[in-house]
Swiss-Prot record:
Keyword annotations from UniProtKB, A to Z: Collagen, Cuticle, Disulfide bond, Repeat
Name of the molecule in the record: Cuticle collagen rol-6
Native source organism of the sequence: Caenorhabditis elegans
Residue ranges with Basic residues bias: 339-348
Keyword Disulfide bond: yes
Superkingdom: Eukaryota
Amino acid sequence: MTLTTATSGAIVFSGATLLVSLFAAASLYSQVSNIWNELDAEIANFRSLTEDMWVDMVKLGAGTASNRVRRQQYGGYGATGVQPPAPTPNPYGGYGASQPAPPEKFPDGIPNGGNQPKFPGGGFPDGPFPNGGGPRGGNQCQCTVENSCPPGPAGPEGEEGPDGHDGQDGVPGFDGKDAEDVQNTPPTGCFTCPQGPLGPQGPNGAPGLRGMRGARGQPGRPGRDGNPGMPGDCGPPGAPGSDGKPGSPGGKGDDGERPLGRPGPRGPPGEAGPEGPQGPTGRDAYPGQSGPQGEPGLQGYGGAAGEDGPEGPPGAPGLPGKDAEYCKCPGREGDAGRSARRHRKFQL
């Protein structure tokens, strides 16, 4: 492949890629425009529905003064409109008012049917116990010594006590005043609806125009020094430098000391050397001392018959024998010599 062919192929590929990119950009722009148009139509439809709902709510009488008195009393989000003055609270505190202490006697001019309750002292009791204290019980300890002991463990749960006595009937209430006439009038102010939940996040908008160039910023802080790098490779050896000037003779050094070291520990034995040549035959050793006599051995086998010994000297003449009788034939000479040698061996 030549250089011209490679260049032509790269140009054709780049052109095709550029055309595909332009087509994709146009398609994306068209899709984004369609989405914007759909969103605008949905928003317009939502606004029209909201206006219709508001008209219906106004026709139904929502937000009028007669329907918002109660909410105003509890501190709602507030509606503006013509409202009649709120009814004054009664002397004992009514709807939305604080509760004052009950009077000692009924006010003058308030009908009670002539049946005023009779309590000790001619008025209302101050509390559940007239004496202002707790329920009557036994003698109570008035000690002032502080008990620093830790509390003991909780005891077992006691038995259920008897039911208490029924309380006294309460004082009859006063008759309420007649309410004033209320007329439904259309609202004269804006109706503020509560803020609804957040909707889903919309698509990213188109990039806006480039803003004006801002002022030049302050110079940044100087950067920190970087970490030391890895050591580089050794360079080639440099050329030898010129010889320096001879230095001045140094001062006389101190006398040297030759320490005498102690002999070190004995080293391990070395390996065996090669076998040397055979030496000359040594002299015969002196005969050693005779060892102790051993135990007698077992009787050996009979040896071969030895040679006949020399004939001995003639013996002395014997004594006269007995009368002649029949005698056996004399034995052979060989048998007599063998028996004699055997007799000598046993003696040894």
